[in-house]
Amino acid sequence: MPSSLTKTESNSDPRTNIQQVPKALDKNVTNSGNLDSTSSSTGSITEDEKRSEPNADSNNMTGGEPIDPRDLDWDGPDDPDNPHNWSSLKKWYTTMTSAFLCLVVTMGSSLYVSSVPELVERYHVSQTLALAGLTFYLLGLSTVIGAPLSEVFGRKPVYLFSLPVSMLFTMGVGLSNGHMRIILPLRFLSGVFASPALSVGSGTILDIFDVDQVSVAMTYFVLSPFLGPVLSPIMAGFATEAKGWRWSEWIQLIAGGLILPFIALMPETHKGIILRKRAKKRNIALKKFSREAQKEFLKTTVTITILRPLKMLVVEPIVFVFSVYVAFIFAILFGFFEAYAVIYRGVYHMSMGISGLPFIGIGVGLWIGAFFYLYIDRKYLFPKPPAGTQPLTEKERTSKRTTPYRGARDAETGELLPVVPEKFLIACKFGSVALPIGLFWQAWTARSDVHWMAPVAAGVPFGFGLILIFFSVLMYFSTCYPPLTVASCLAANNLLRYVMSSVFPLFTIQMYTKMKIKWASTLFALVCVVMIPIPWVFEKWGSKLRHKSQFGYAAMEKEAETEGGIDDVNAVDGELNLTRMTTLRTMETDPSTREKPGERLSLRRTHTQPVPASFDREDGQHAQNRNEPISNSLYSAIKDNEDGYSYTEMATDASARMV
């Protein structure tokens, strides 16, 4: 899962603290992005902002011009304020709090389903209209506005504001008199204010774990949006059966109240927010967020979260195919909320409470799939460094850790090797086969002459395949596109996933009633069989599709060449090895472009205009102040022999620094 940019030795001794921002973004605007885990992400994309000199802050304390907040950085790799240097207890407290918050808000989807039978009987509404409460909540969860807000105000304030507001709307549903014209808008608003838990949570995890440690934490976090809908029917079934439909809302309200104090005690993790607060304590004057920057930020937010995701669904085959794939299997899960009632209450005559227990089978499959993915990640994608591997140097460290990064290494040089994006599809291959097996299993065993344990066990391969496919797609998107474009990919996936999931429960009962259980589940299974070749197809032709992408790294380089041209004469001395990929900062490196295994792809700095004299390494003034901006800089990954290219990263004024 994780990745990193590590440095090579060079005469110029460059550092890797490169901040990536959109081309249209003003220098005062903070970047944004998201990772739903079911999703997406976002998280902070300013993790490796430029590193200021240790005495930069102290120089400003004596007066002078206010400095750009983005010029702030840690005092060094051992800075105790850096979340990467927190104790394991503090890291895991923050991780589990974020994960349980995700669990609480996703529980709200299926908790409501248990109230539908009583709403239909008591208030004389149609079953489809009653189920619309689930639809409206899922539509609310599809919004991703929380991620960019967290880049401005921080993770913790967004959590503390959004959850109580969502709980107030949940309380309104519980106190309503059953009129759907009241319940439906309240359910939608509850989902909207619950959505930041999903869109901001992944950024919280990436804020605190080093690149080669994030897999385990992210796995537990991504499990939450799946476990929430699976576990809540078990609780709500017994509660509504004994106390009435309103308890489907009270359970979520109680869960939200329990997690709120833990959020209040959770530390802020966003790098920019931590450094800004510390700057105020040190009496450092900071530039304010100008009105022009606010407008630019709003424009960028709308582009990243709404306009670009919709366009990518139309013009990007990678985004469209995998988003439809994930959305369909996720929608099947939500369709099971009604299908399981038909199977276990209709065929096996279980009570409301007992009929929720079969979801345990899917939950077991989710856990097995998560552990299996961790095994693939540690043994195949990013294996442990071999014995004798040199520890990281002080220049290579971004935290106090000195252990080598994980990952495949060149047998001769011991250098970390890049990972082709299609390599992450290996887990998707296992999942694509397991998913239809579980559906066929359920289809042909859910009958009265077969014990109920048989269809319950069918949930294990279904959950196993579901989580593996989601993990693979998440990583594939993250390594195919630049950081801000990844945020749009995940937003597109999140939107399509929850929109499709909101529709499936509306026709599931009719489908299972008229087609019968056998053929309804078989139909789902056959669609999944048709989708089995997807990971193999993209493994073979994915590289060509990436090179033709309108939003990938190749497109960015073509745009840079068109607008400014690349002048190799202005190339800055020094290279940066590209070794691993993260969900927020990645460069695509395809070993198929290398002429021999030992050849490496490196990150070289070039410029779209002549370099000012102040950037000359021999210039005395620059030697004193090494924080000069590189105007209109372009970061391009090229082969060592400069014969051909890999891909590029764009940066605007003041977004990248010579250090």
Curated annotation (Swiss-Prot):
Organism encoding this protein: Saccharomyces cerevisiae (strain ATCC 204508 / S288c) (Baker's yeast)
GO annotations of cellular component type: cell periphery; fungal-type vacuole membrane; plasma membrane
Keyword Transmembrane helix carried by entry: yes
Segments traversing the membrane: 100-120, 129-149, 158-178, 188-208, 216-236, 247-267, 317-337, 356-376, 424-444, 457-477, 487-509, 519-539
Family under the similarity heading: Belongs to the major facilitator superfamily. DHA1 family. Polyamines/proton antiporter (TC 2.A.1.2.16) subfamily.
Full protein name: Polyamine transporter 4
Phosphoserine, modified sites: S633, S646
Regulation: induction: By transcription factor HAA1 in response to acetaldehyde accumulation.
